[in-house]
A protein has these predicted regions:
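Solvent-exposed serine/threonine-rich low-complexity stretches and specific carbohydrate-binding patches
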Residues: 18-29
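Histidine-/acidic-rich catalytic cores in large beta-rich domains
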Residues: 2-13, 29-33, 37, 41-472
């Protein structure tokens, strides 16, 4: 026997477009246990194991077959359809669908779908005594160590698992004074950023609990809270009630308690980029100082007006219509954030985010089909001149059938430069039924190079990623 590595190949079904799953493990021991991922359900899978020496030379190989069972879960989509695919133009990888199950209190069920619409990986927590009824409103993110991290909104924990679903860390956030909400990410130091509620925080009456208006930084190895940002000291907490007058009984409606509804946080250089469903997109520094805010100018108190960026037309000229600036009217070449999610920095310094279109122009008239649409938007921000210009969008042309009032997200795809636009609920699908979509768009041509329909399904986020972590 010699030291060496194992290369795994899970062969694709004949006639399929998804490439074989290939992965070389880093372990060089004489005895190795390897996780085999990417098996088709209800199929006699063909697997090849290649044994190499330390120089990468093949020493032997084995061909195996492994019969799998049918997936049985009421939480999976009624049907998965690939309605469009230009496989040579797509970003490589699987689509990680972060589904909450059948509702917010159900057991979440993340799964990966390949380019042919086949489920190739699933994390079935329903069979776990530890994680049954886990609520991954945050969705799984892949950490720098190759594991997954998520926030559990049902039990208010921060959970780290490996690719086989084994628990690595399970941090009780209630013990730390927080409940989980909607988004987590990892900074360049490896710390976790999370949008949370603080259990001891009250609104001005000293009675009602504030929700969804804190951001924390946590050491994922020690569970130590390293920093806390209170949005009340950063944004205008008196700016609420403009939209949801008829939804005051809804726990997710805008109110004195849920005035911000923060739902996205990422590191951006030495600063941070965040979204709040009801307040827009904002950039802040480590000390909690607001650098700027992208939001309709209506209803902000005077002391915040200097933080608001001024909108430009596509040609770079200022928008001067006071109704457009205030947000009570929309112009053809600029959209304010309405019910926004998941702002992410782009390599060119711009911002890509998901604009749900919820409460556009401060109205909640879902019968106004002309004004009901969802889109992914790219902004160019000029921090010197304090302006914001919309340079790209996709989704408005799809109309009301593409509208999703909540959840959802976007992703910049690094290899191709494509964008993943992900309306996670309430879409009218090609057969007339409701569900969710995953749309991959080439921003240079506006071509849809891939679109997936998930019938009778919802999700929080979708991410295109490799099945195995690339750095492990």
């Amino acid at each position: 026997p010699v030291l060496g590595r194992i290369k795994l190949i899970v062969h694709s079904k004949p006639g399929k477009h998804t490439p074989d799953v290939e992965y070389t493990f880093k372990d060089v021991g004489l005895k190795q246990n390897i996780p085999v991922l990417g098996l088709y359900p209800n199929y006699n899978n063909q697997i090849t194991l290649i044994y190499t020496d330390l120089q990468g030379n093949e020493r032997a190989r084995s061909n195996l077959k492994l019969q799998t069972k049918t997936l049985e879960s009421r939480r999976l989509p009624k049907e998965i359809r690939v309605v469009k695919a230009q496989y040579d133009r797509m970003e490589p990888g699987m689509n990680l669908v972060n589904s909450p199950g059948q509702d917010e209190t159900d057991t979440s069920i993340p799964y990966m779908i390949d380019a042919d619409g086949e489920i190739r990986w699933i994390l079935d927590w329903e069979k776990s005594d530890e994680h049954r009824y886990i609520g991954i409103g945050c969705g799984l993110i892949r950490m720098q160590n190759g594991h997954y991290m998520t926030g559990d909104g049902n039990h208010h924990r921060m959970v780290e698992v490996d690719m086989m679903g084994n628990t690595i860390h399970n941090w009780d956030m209630l013990e730390r004074g927080y409940t989980m909400h909607h988004a987590i990410s990892q900074d360049k130091q490896g710390n976790i950023l999370a949008t949370v509620s603080k259990t001891s925080a009250k609104i001005a009456n000293g009675k009602d609990v504030r929700i969804n208006d804190f951001i924390i930084m946590m050491d994922p190895e020690k569970g130590e809270i390293l920093q806390e940002w209170d949005l009340v000291h950063m944004l205008d907490s008196a700016r609420y009630g403009m939209t949801d007058y008829d939804l005051t009984s809804d726990p997710f409606a805008q109110s004195a308690s849920n005035w911000a509804h923060n739902n996205g946080i990422v590191e951006w250089g030495d600063d941070y980029l965040a979204t709040a469903r009801y307040q827009g997109i904002f950039k802040f520094n480590k000390a909690g100082g607001i650098e700027w805010i992208i939001s309709p100018h209506g209803y902000w108190r005077d002391k915040y007006l200097k933080l608001l960026l001024n909108p430009l037309h596509a040609d770079g000229t200022p928008i001067t219509d006071p109704e457009v600036i205030a947000g009570t009217k929309t112009c053809d070449d600029f959209e304010w954030p309405w019910g926004c999610h998941t702002a992410v920095p782009l390599p060119n310094g711009h911002i890509l985010y998901f604009n749900n279109g919820y409460g556009r122009n401060f109205k909640l008239d879902f019968t106004d089909r002309k004004n009901i649409y969802t889109c992914g938007i790219e902004y160019e921000v000029d921090e010197v001149n304090r302006t914001v210009r919309q340079v790209w969008q996709y989704g408005k042309e799809r109309g009301a059938a593409y509208f999703t009032p909540a959840r959802s997200g976007v992703q910049y795809l690094e290899q191709t430069g494509n964008r993943l636009i992900c309306p996670g609920m309430s879409n009218v699908l090609s057969n007339g039924n409701r569900g969710a979509r995953v749309t991959e768009v080439d921003p240079e041509t506006q071509d849809v190079v891939f679109e997936l329909e998930l019938e009778d399904a919802i999700y929080q986020r979708v991410y295109r990623m490799s099945l195995y972590p690339e750095n492990q």
